[in-house]
């Protein structure tokens, strides 16, 4: 029998049991998206362990108002839902000062509200007694809570509040490489890091992890920020097509990752803890690496049109924008994209004119960061552009792209204030 802990695999959507969970328990149409996979995998695992029995008591952590919690709540005795709820939360699903009322009011289908309680709580410090829950679960939440000591504190707290035979089902970000990627507020975990972390917390993934991937085209990695490469992503047709694009194996920069489901139980005294073995992982890495090479070859020979306003969510396209000199407010800012390892020409093309007749100046820049250290941002090139009157400006920077890094194009006003309109950013082969 294969272990319940496993990597996200496009072939999972062909499993009739998995399909039933999506259609019946989640009440959704199947789509190749790893978030749906996470929800369905957690449900399927809890079901297979006999924990969706109408009497069990469970704990959800970091779930906001996710659909999954309602699917679980209607099949257990009681589900306690926790998150860092608050009106100022950066997460839309957790943006409430009255989580119990808000969560119960947000149910996408009928759920007996007496089976559900929501409260604000830090998953590193669970305010419950010892051994009170039959199961706990979290869906891609742990990677957001900090660093190693935070992850360890969380797992130890879960171990404490679980009954001796309890199960913790979690999904998280899995990097196929040997390194951990400590992105701000979002870690991508390696196999060895998770193995050591789980062992240190006194947990084991009984039977190891199924690391096999089917040779399916939807298992070829694509950029997680694919929308950043499409300036017209807000267009109805483009947006609809993007919503149908597989979101299974992904790239952050040039680094491949996916979702991993771990099914953890308390390690017996003297038993080997951790998540090993991970069956067929090396074969899966070879398949994924071939997909990365294919994407790299495509990117290196293709012109790329970048969305200039990824970092400016409040900007309305087609409306002129007034920006004053500021260190913190960019004129525009693309997302960080992987360009492979060849020389690239970056062309910025836009209408600009000074505000109130005064002169202005803008600085156009290309920034980069190593994919393994996304917090280490450096300037890869810049040019200053004086703005004296209304005109169409076209400037070009040339960079030697490093395939270990990702790049963003941005600008800021360095003097005065100016209007901009019809901004276009293109990356080509010079």
Give the positions of each predicted feature.
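Conserved class I S-adenosyl-L-methionine
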Residues: 52-64
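Class I SAM-dependent methyltransferase SAM/SAH-binding core
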Residues: 59, 66-125
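A short acidic, Gly/Pro-enriched loop at the edge of an enzyme's catalytic core
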Residues: 121-136
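A short glycine-rich, Lys/Arg-flanked "PGG" loop and its adjoining helix->strand segment in the class I
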Residues: 150-164
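Conserved beta-strand signature within the Rossmann-like core of class I S-adenosyl-L-methionine
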Residues: 165-173
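Conserved Class I S-adenosyl-L-methionine
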Residues: 179-214
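Short carbohydrate-recognition loop motifs
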Residues: 309-330
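Extra-cytoplasmic beta-strand recognition segments
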Residues: 334-362, 393-397, 401, 407-411, ...
């Amino acid at each position: 029998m294969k272990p319940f802990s496993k990597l996200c695999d496009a072939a999972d959507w062909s499993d009739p049991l998995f399909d039933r969970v999506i259609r019946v328990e989640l009440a959704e149409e199947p789509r190749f998206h790893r978030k749906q996979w996470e929800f369905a995998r957690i449900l399927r695992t809890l079901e297979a362990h006999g924990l969706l029995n109408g009497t069990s008591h469970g704990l959800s952590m970091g779930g906001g108002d996710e659909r999954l919690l309602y699917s679980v709540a209607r099949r257990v005795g009681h589900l306690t839902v926790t998150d860092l709820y608050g009106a100022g939360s950066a997460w839309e699903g957790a943006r409430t000062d009255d989580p119990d009322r808000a969560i119960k009011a947000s149910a996408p289908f009928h759920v007996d509200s007496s089976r559900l309680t929501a409260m604000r709580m830090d998953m590193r410090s669970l305010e419950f007694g010892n051994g009170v829950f039959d199961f706990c679960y979290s869906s891609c939440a742990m990677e957001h809570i900090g660093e190693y000591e935070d992850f360890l504190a969380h797992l130890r707290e879960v171990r404490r509040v679980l009954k001796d035979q309890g199960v913790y089902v979690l999904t998280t970000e899995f990097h196929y490489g040997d390194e951990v990627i400590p992105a701000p507020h979002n870690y991508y975990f390696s196999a060895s890091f998770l193995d050591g972390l789980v062992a240190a917390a006194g947990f084991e993934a009984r039977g190891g992890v199924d690391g096999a991937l089917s040779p399916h085209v939807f298992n070829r990695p694509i950029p997680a920020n694919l929308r950043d490469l499409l300036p017209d992503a807000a267009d109805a047709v483009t947006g609809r097509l993007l919503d149908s694009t597989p979101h299974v194996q992904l790239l952050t920069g040039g680094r491949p990752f996916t979702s991993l489901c771990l099914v953890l139980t308390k390690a017996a005294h003297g038993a080997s803890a951790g998540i090993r073995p991970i069956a067929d992982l090396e074969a899966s890495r070879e398949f994924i690496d071939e997909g990365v090479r294919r994407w790299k070859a495509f990117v290196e020979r293709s012109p790329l049109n970048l969305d200039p306003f990824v970092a400016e969510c409040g900007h309305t396209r087609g409306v002129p924008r007034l920006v004053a000199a500021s260190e913190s407010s960019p004129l525009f800012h693309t997302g960080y994209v992987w360009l492979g390892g060849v020389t690239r020409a970056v062309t910025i093309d836009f209408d600009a004119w000074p505000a109130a007749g005064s002169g202005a100046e803008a600085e156009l820049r290309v920034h980069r960061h190593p994919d393994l250290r996304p917090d280490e941002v450096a300037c890869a090139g810049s040019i200053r552009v004086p703005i004296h009157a209304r005109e169409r400006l076209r400037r070009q920077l040339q960079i030697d792209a490093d395939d270990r890094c990702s790049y963003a194009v941005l600008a800021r006003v360095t003097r005065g204030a100016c209007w901009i309109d019809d901004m276009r950013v293109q990356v080509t082969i010079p």
